[in-house]
Amino acid sequence: MFDPSRHTVLNPATWDPAVARAAIQDIARDAATGFDPKAYWPAHPQDGIPDGGAGLYFGAAGVLWAMDFLRREGVADHPLDIPTLLPRLLEVNRRQYAAIAPGSKIEPRRPSYLFGDVPVLLMMIRAGDAGAADDLFGRIEDNLDLPALELMWGFAGNMLACVFAASVTGEDRWRDLFLAQARALLDDLEDTERGPVWTQHLYGRATRFLGPVHGYAGNMLALMRGWDWLDDADQARIRQAVPATLTANAIRGELGVNWPPAISSDPIPTLVQHCHGAPGMVTALADQRIDGPDLRELLEGGGELTWRAGPLAKGSNLCHGTGGNGYAFLKLHELTGAEIWLNRARAFAMAAIEQYRAASVEHGRGRYALWTGDVGLACYLNECLRGSARFPTADVF
């Protein structure tokens, strides 16, 4: 059901809100201290990328978004004047994206949520930039033929951007743009013997990914974020499709339930992470709007496996770390109201804090990234303090 070498034993530690608050403040303080207005932040050795990245996933856009979010939440204070940094960040992001996109077989003209300019424009909209909304709208409207049917490079990320832009601007045009993408996405949903699925054309190959970053769960998450904009027929289709696909691809065992990263001839899963495996499936799809007894049983089985597997050895981060896995527990607590899930989320939080502090000592520095670094953990700790389940940039922006 999982690879034990990818996990560590959970050392029991009593949940301590003061410890969580202190970790958030330390993370924010370190990020502010390590910031350079021209070079941004150095890359972490474990990320294997050049210094000064400007994207959302593991670059300056993600760190600045998190720093702004944590300040809005009232859990971190820092001196960064984020709105003044955004125009240059947009330029740097676009220049970097034009250089890296072809290496992933992505056309540089295509917008990307996790690596491109989409989140930077969203931040500029929030900061009151007069032209950013039109810029973002045009970028998405000009790319309604995206070949990537997923969140990182494709429709799902841009659909989330429409939802967040609408919440800030109050403009109806974002609804229409969301629905144009939703229609294209649902038209490409294929009925197969493994349930309704999408085929992702990524990195020069066709794959039917299931997870929230590259696959099925991420597409459904985006559709559900615009739920009130969908008509009754599309809502009914989603309610039918999600349990059908999760049931058809679930791997059940005594330890719980897992899902493979993709539909293939060898579906035995070993990954238990947000990006691939049970935690991400639970976090993306534990939603009251599609809840039902069969789906809930599967999702709780995924949560049980996540708990039994234990914290991830890769560290405290969101994408493939302990913090990201903990969101599955927060989502199940939100869905079911059962306190056991909140207690488990907070147990993972204490473990993740230990991992963060140990890694900081080992490397002599922090890890400056949203999806793979310390500020993502800070966002998770804030949710554990609140008892809520908002995954950064997927549920809240």
Question: What do the predicted segments below correspond to?
Answer:
Residues 1-30, 225, 229, 287, ...:
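Terminal, non-catalytic domain-edge segments
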Residues 21-40, 81-103, 128-148, 177-197, ...:
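Long, well-ordered core segments of solenoidal/helical folds
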Residues 115-119, 131-135, 153-160, 169, ...:
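Residues forming well-ordered secondary-structure scaffolds
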Residues 173-290, 296:
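Extended ligand-binding clefts on enzyme/binding-domain cores
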Residues 306-341, 348:
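Loop/turn-rich, solvent-exposed surfaces of beta-rich toroidal or solenoidal domains
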